[in-house]
C-alpha cells in the first residue's frame, strides 16, 4: 500500500508545549461537557429536543470517514458541496445553507470549537462520538445554528493505553492509512495522544484538454496532538490540542446537465485542470474547575486557514487564493448534581473572524477582472439557560442570548482596466430566546414541546463585485415551533417530532454565476414530520429505520422567488439499516446492509435545476480475525446509482457535479493493546 511520510508532522506535534486538555475521561453525567453539548444531561435543553448520538463503532461500521458522509448515520441531515469542499451545502429541517456558503445553517463543532465554514467538510480523525441537535440552537450556540448543530467529540487521552493502525484501499486507486497512540505520560498527572492520517479519495473525471483522468477527488494529510494535565485528587485540569490538515483537491469538475453518467468534463478547449489546496492549523487551550455545586469551563481556540484555488469558468481562468483567521473564547458555568430543583448554565462568548481574498478572472488574451478584499466579523454574546424540575416527571426550561455583531469590508480592483472599490462597517444587536416543557408519561416515554429562535448575522459579501457598493445585508432570523416524543427501553428506541419554522430576511445568492452576491430575498416557511427508530431484535442484531417529509417554500411576499421551493432541501428522505454479529469458530462476522433514499430537490431559487429522487444501497462485512485485528470489506452504492450533487446555469445551458458511483474497498485495523 502506498504510504505518505508524516514523520516531520509528528515530530513537530511532539515538540508542542506541554499544556493539557480540559476534558476528563470520566465525567458525571450531569456535568457540563466542554467537548460535547453545552448543557447538562438533566437540562430541558438536552431532553426537550430531537437529537441523535452516534458512537465511534457505528461510524466505522457505516464507513463514515469524513464529515460529508455523516448523513449516512444522522437522519434528516444533508451535506454536499457546491463546487468543491470549501463550500458546503447543508440542509436540516427545511433550513438550507444554499443561502450563504460562508454562514452555514448548521454549524460543525469539533471538541466544542466552531469550525470555519470553509472547514466544514473535513476528514474525521480520532472520533469518540457525534451528536446532532435538530432545530434552532441559537440561545446556547449563537449564530449559524438555525437548522441545528453537529458536535464531533474526539477521544481524550487518559490512564488507559490505546493505540492502533489502520489501512485500506478502495476503488479509483484510493487508500487510507492511520496511526493513533494515546495514554499516560506520567500516570496520575499528564496524558497525551498523537494521530496521523493520510486519506486519498481519487476521482475518475476526465479533462479532454489535458488528458487527466482522475479529477474530482481529494488527498488529505492530517496530524493531531493532545496533552492533558489532570492531577489526581485535584478539582482542576487543563488541556492543549493542536492539529494541521492539508488537502489537495481537483474538484470544480462539471459535466453536462443530462450527462450524469459521463466522465468527460464540460469544459472549454485548452482549459487546465481544476486545482485546490487547503491547509488549516487549529489550536485549542481549555480548562475545567469543579466545586461541590458548580463546574466552570474555559476554552480558547484559534484557526488559521489558507487555500489556493484555480478552475476554468467558461472562457475564463479563475485564480482565487484566500486566507482565514478565527479565534474563539468562551467561559461557562453550570450547576452540578442530580438533586437540584433548578439547573442553570451561564456563559460569555466571543468570536472574531478575519478574511482576505485575492481573485483574478483572466481571458486567454488579457486580464478580465482582479480584486482584493478584506472582511471582518466579530460577535460578543452572553447567554443563560435554566431548567426548573417541577416534579420528578415534569420540567420546564428557558434560555436567552444577547449578541452584538460587528462586520466590516474593504475592497478594490479593476474590471477591463476600470477601477472599482468601496468600504463599509455595520453592527447589529440580537436577542434570542427559547422555551420548552417536557413530561415523562412513563419511566421510558417522554413528550415535549419547544419554541426556539436562530439567526445568521448581518454582514457583507466576501467576494467583491464590480459596480456594487459595500451595502450590508441584514440578519436572517428564524423561529421554530416543535412537538416531539421519545421512547427508550433496552430493546427499542423511538423518537418523532413535527415542526414549523418561519424564516425572514433570508440571505440568498443571486446574479450571474461566479459573480453572485448575497442579498435578503424575503421569507420562507418549513413544515415537516420526522421519525427515527432502532429495534434490537436479537442479541448482537439491530434494525434502524428513519424518515422525514418536509415542505420548505418561499412565501408569496418574497421578492425574488415567491412560491418556489427553497433550494437544497429534499421533499422527503428515508433510511434503513440492519447490523448484526454472527459468532463463528474463526471469529465474529459483522454484516451490515443500509439503504438511503433522498427525495427531489432544486439547486437554484428559480427552481429550474431539479434533481429527482434517488436511492443508494451500501453493504459491508467485518471479520474479527483475532482479538486485536479486524478486517472489513464493503461496497458503497452497490447498484452504481448516479445523481447530481450540485448544478448551475452556465450561460444558456446547465452543468452539474455528480457523485462518484460504486466504491469497493477493504480496511484492516490492528490494535496495539
Swiss-Prot record:
Induction: By iron starvation. Iron regulation mediated through the Fur protein.
Alphabetically ordered keywords of this record: Cell outer membrane, Ion transport, Iron, Iron transport, Membrane, Receptor, Signal, TonB box, Transmembrane, Transmembrane beta strand, Transport
GO cellular component: cell outer membrane
CDD domains the UniProt entry points to: ligand_gated_channel (cd01347)
Residue ranges annotated as motif TonB C-terminal box: 657-673
The keyword Transmembrane belongs to this UniProt entry's keyword annotation: yes
TBDR beta-barrel domain span: 160-672
Keyword Ribosomal protein: no
Domain TBDR plug: 41-155
Entry's Gene Ontology molecular function annotations: siderophore uptake transmembrane transporter activity; signaling receptor activity
Protein name: Pesticin receptor
Source organism per UniProt: Yersinia pestis
Name of the encoding gene: fyuA
Amino acid at each position: 500500500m502506498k504510504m505518505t511520510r508524516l514523520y516531520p508532522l509528528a515530530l513537530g506535534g511532539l515538540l508542542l508545549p506541554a499544556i493539557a486538555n480540559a476534558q476528563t475521561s470520566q465525567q458525571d453525567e450531569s456535568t457540563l461537557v466542554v467537548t460535547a453539548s453545552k448543557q447538562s444531561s438533566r437540562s430541558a435543553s438536552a431532553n426537550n429536543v430531537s437529537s441523535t448520538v452516534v458512537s465511534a463503532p457505528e461510524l466505522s461500521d457505516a464507513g463514515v470517514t469524513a464529515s460529508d458522509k455523516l448523513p449516512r448515520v444522522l437522519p434528516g441531515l444533508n451535506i454536499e458541496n457546491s463546487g468543491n469542499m470549501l463550500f458546503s451545502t447543508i440542509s436540516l429541517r427545511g433550513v438550507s445553507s444554499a443561502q450563504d456558503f460562508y454562514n452555514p445553517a448548521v454549524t460543525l463543532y469539533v471538541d466544542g470549537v466552531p469550525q470555519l465554514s470553509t472547514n466544514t467538510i473535513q476528514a474525521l480523525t480520532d472520533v469518540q462520538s457525534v451528536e446532532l441537535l435538530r432545530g434552532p440552537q441559537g440561545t446556547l450556540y449563537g449564530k449559524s445554528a438555525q437548522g441545528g448543530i453537529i458536535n464531533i467529540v474526539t477521544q481524550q487521552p487518559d490512564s488507559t493505553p490505546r493505540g492502533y493502525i489502520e489501512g485500506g484501499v478502495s476503488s479509483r486507486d484510493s487508500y487510507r492509512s492511520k496511526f493513533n497512540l494515546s495514554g499516560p505520560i506520567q500516570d496520575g498527572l499528564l496524558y497525551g495522544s498523537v494521530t496521523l492520517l493520510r486519506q486519498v479519495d481519487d476521482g475518475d473525471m476526465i479533462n479532454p484538454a489535458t488528458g487527466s483522468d482522475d479529477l474530482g477527488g481529494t488527498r488529505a494529510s492530517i496530524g493531531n496532538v493532545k496533552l492533558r494535565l489532570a492531577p489526581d485528587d485535584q478539582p482542576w485540569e487543563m488541556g492543549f490540542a493542536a492539529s494541521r490538515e492539508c488537502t489537495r483537491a481537483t474538484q470544480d469538475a462539471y459535466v453536462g446537465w443530462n450527462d450524469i453518467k459521463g466522465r468527460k468534463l464540460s469544459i472549454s478547449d485548452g482549459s487546465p485542470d481544476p486545482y485546490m489546496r487547503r491547509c488549516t492549523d487549529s489550536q485549542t487551550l481549555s480548562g475545567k474547575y469543579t466545586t461541590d455545586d458548580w463546574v466552570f469551563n474555559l476554552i480558547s481556540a484559534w484557526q488559521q486557514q489558507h487555500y489556493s484555488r484555480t478552475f476554468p469558468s467558461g472562457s475564463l481562468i479563475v485564480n482565487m487564493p484566500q486566507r482565514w483567521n478565527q479565534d474563539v473564547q468562551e467561559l461557562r458555568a453550570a450547576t452540578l448534581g442530580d438533586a437540584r430543583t433548578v439547573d442553570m448554565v451561564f456563559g460569555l462568548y466571543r468570536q472574531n473572524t478575519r478574511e482576505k481574498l485575492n481573485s483574478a478572472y483572466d481571458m486567454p488574451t488579457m486580464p478580465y477582472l482582479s480584486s482584493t478584499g478584506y472582511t471582518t466579523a466579530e460577535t460578543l454574546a452572553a447567554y443563560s439557560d435554566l431548567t426548573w424540575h417541577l416534579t420528578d416527571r415534569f420540567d420546564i426550561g428557558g434560555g436567552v442570548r444577547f449578541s452584538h455583531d460587528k462586520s466590516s469590508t474593504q475592497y478594490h480592483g479593476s474590471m477591463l482596466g476600470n477601477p472599482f472599490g468601496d468600504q463599509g462597517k455595520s453592527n447589529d444587536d440580537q436577542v434570542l430566546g427559547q422555551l420548552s416543557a417536557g413530561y415523562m408519561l412513563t419511566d421510558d416515554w417522554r413528550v415535549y414541546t419547544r419554541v426556539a429562535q436562530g439567526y445568521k448575522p448581518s454582514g457583507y459579501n466576501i467576494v467583491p463585485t464590480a459596480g456594487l457598493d459595500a451595502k450590508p445585508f441584514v440578519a436572517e432570523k428564524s423561529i421554530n415551533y416543535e412537538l416531539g416524543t421519545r421512547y427508550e427501553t433496552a430493546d427499542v428506541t423511538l423518537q418523532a417530532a413535527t415542526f414549523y419554522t418561519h424564516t425572514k430576511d433570508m440571505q440568498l445568492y443571486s446574479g450571474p454565476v461566479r459573480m453572485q452576491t448575497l442579498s435578503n430575498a424575503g421569507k420562507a416557511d418549513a413544515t415537516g414530520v420526522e421519525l427515527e427508530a432502532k429495534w434490537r431484535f436479537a442479541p448482537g442484531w439491530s434494525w434502524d429505520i428513519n424518515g422525514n417529509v418536509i415542505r420548505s417554500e418561499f412565501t408569496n411576499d418574497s421578492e425574488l422567488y415567491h412560491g418556489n421551493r427553497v433550494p437544497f432541501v429534499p421533499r422527503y428522505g428515508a433510511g434503513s439499516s440492519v447490523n448484526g454479529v454472527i459468532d463463528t469458530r474463526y471469529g465474529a462476522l459483522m454484516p451490515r446492509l443500509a439503504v438511503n433514499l433522498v427525495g427531489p430537490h432544486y439547486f437554484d431559487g428559480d427552481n429550474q435545476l431539479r434533481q429527482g429522487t434517488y436511492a443508494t444501497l451500501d453493504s459491508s462485512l467485518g471479520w474479527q480475525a483475532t482479538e486485536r485485528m479486524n478486517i472489513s470489506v464493503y461496497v458503497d452504492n452497490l447498484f452504481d446509482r448516479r445523481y447530481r450533487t450540485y448544478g448551475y446555469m452556465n450561460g444558456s445551458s446547465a452543468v452539474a457535479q455528480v457523485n462518484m458511483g460504486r466504491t469497493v474497498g477493504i480496511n484492516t485495523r490492528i490494535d496495539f493493546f
